[in-house]
């Protein structure tokens, strides 16, 4: 059934339901990935089989084969020697679940996408954006194995730089989907000063930098060190000789536990301050929806800062660390919504969907209007 003139608000209803599901699955994937890291389960599967690897060991012989593979890597020999098969199964299931969820996301994204393309439900501008998101998702699978491979030969854990890259790419994909969903909403343009647009974009950019810095802290397990606040290593600003002792100097930004955690703290202060200034400006100019968005973002960052402080004080226990990671997703979502809200015009949204307007080949009974 062809819809000759679907209302703007319902034009992409089916596509938006699909993308919302994908975004939710990615959020779950990020949290499962965090739990996999915190339980030190990420190296339990030492091979990459994108298709046949979807099946776990089904017999005792297969379990022993998988366990024997794990016994060959440094993590087992140096950290987990003497681990029992039952203990191995625990860490195996975390990593297997993480990989399985990645496969599920790929299927949930690709099959409906192809169906919508076949039905002519997606205009040319959206096709380009959604194909790029799919390509990033495929790349993410390869990046995940690239990360795991870094811990299979010499290290007892994965490279923190590769871990940060893996997480950052997942968050970029998530943010792109949230941005796309917002553009499809076809809401009226928000009237606000240009400086609010600038600070909203700065907040989004700084949020990504902070998320990358947080991933470095996680990868180095730096949150289990320097467990005081506001002091770090006995001072508000640690001694330069300890912050920059590695050569060349830039290696400290990625490898020095003290520098990495200090940078994460300083970025948090900068992000919170910028969010406060953005909120005050939005409230003073009575920017409507933008003011509400600014308040929500500031409140989320305040909660996130508190979670970060407690995570450090208690040396990064799993529950607090996961809560901190979950709240980071909330902050990113709100930052994306605020930036999109202040940068898009109504004309932008209308033009992007023009290719499908008037020929949205989606059965109305499948996605009825709310």
UniProtKB/Swiss-Prot annotation:
* Keywords recorded for this protein, A-Z: Cell membrane, Heme biosynthesis, Iron, Membrane, Metal-binding, Oxidoreductase, Transmembrane, Transmembrane helix
* Name of this chain's protein: Heme A synthase
Q: Give an example GO biological process.
A: heme A biosynthetic process
The UniProt family comment states: Belongs to the COX15/CtaA family. Type 2 subfamily.
Cofactor field: heme b
**Compartmental location:** Cell membrane
Membrane topology, as annotated, equals:
Multi-pass membrane protein
Query: Where does this protein act, in terms of pathway?
Result: Porphyrin-containing compound metabolism; heme A biosynthesis; heme A from heme O: step 1/1
Q: Where are the transmembrane segments?
A: 15-35, 104-124, 129-149, 161-181, 200-220, 261-280, 293-313, 317-337
> Record's Gene Ontology CC terms?
plasma membrane
Q: Which residues bind heme?
A: 264, 324
EC number(s) on record? Answer: 1.17.99.9
Q: Per its database record, what is this protein's job?
A: Catalyzes the conversion of heme O to heme A by two successive hydroxylations of the methyl group at C8. The first hydroxylation forms heme I, the second hydroxylation results in an unstable dihydroxymethyl group, which spontaneously dehydrates, resulting in the formyl group of heme A.
Pfam families registered for this protein in UniProt: COX15-CtaA
Question: InterPro entries under this entry?
Answer: COX15/CtaA_fam (IPR003780), HemeA_Synthase_type2 (IPR023754)
How the protein assembles, per its UniProt entry? Interacts with CtaB.
Q: Name one GO molecular function term.
A: metal ion binding
Enzyme class label: oxidoreductase
State the organism named in the record: Rhodopseudomonas palustris (strain TIE-1)
Coiled coil feature spans:
none
Report which reactions are catalysed by this protein.
Answer: Fe(II)-heme o + 2 A + H2O = Fe(II)-heme a + 2 AH2
